[in-house]
């Protein structure tokens, strides 16, 4: 919450509804500070997204801080100068990065990937598989390149230990 409070316009995506609720509660309630998760009914989610989109269109310096679960990662056309994403699979991190400087108006912008305490992260098997797939691809590569995503998913899905086994 402290890091998010340093930014006037920021999006933070976390892995669970509980984390979204707790982080939102710790943010200063100034300007437009929003929580988005499936704890909300669909009508309230739509209303909140509409409020957010309208606020982002306004070029004032109003504070806009949003804490959301993954529901904002795909199919939501929003643009923030700074995005924070709790550690997750590469696909989720890249979806979150797609909400950062989406329109290219801000020059270089930053997406930060962070970890919370162990009890707030993805299930161990899921996180381990995602990390192994990421590490196997190496460093210094273009994570947005289609061939990199293909390689990532091949590595991820060949590791059956992260999936349910009957």
Language model features with spans:
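Conserved two-lobed SF2 helicase motor
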Residues: 57-73, 85
């Amino acid at each position: 919450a402290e890091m998010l409070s340093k930014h006037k316009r920021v999006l933070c995506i976390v892995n669970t509804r509980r984390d979204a609720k707790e982080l939102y509660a710790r943010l200063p309630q100034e300007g437009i500070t929003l929580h988005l998760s499936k704890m909300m009914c669909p009508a309230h989610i739509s209303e909140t997204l509409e409020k957010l989109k309208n606020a982002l269109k306004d070029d004032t310096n109003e504070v806009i801080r949003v804490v959301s679960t993954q529901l904002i990662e795909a199919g939501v056309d929003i643009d923030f100068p700074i995005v924070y994403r709790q550690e997750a699979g590469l696909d989720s991190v890249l979806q979150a990065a797609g909400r950062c400087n989406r329109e290219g108006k801000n020059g270089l912008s930053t997406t930060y990937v962070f970890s919370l305490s162990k009890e707030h992260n993805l299930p161990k098997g899921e996180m381990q598989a995602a990390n192994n797939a990421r590490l196997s691809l190496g460093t210094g590569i273009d994570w947005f390149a289609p061939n990199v995503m293909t390689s990532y998913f091949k590595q991820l899905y060949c590791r059956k230990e992260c999936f349910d086994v009957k």
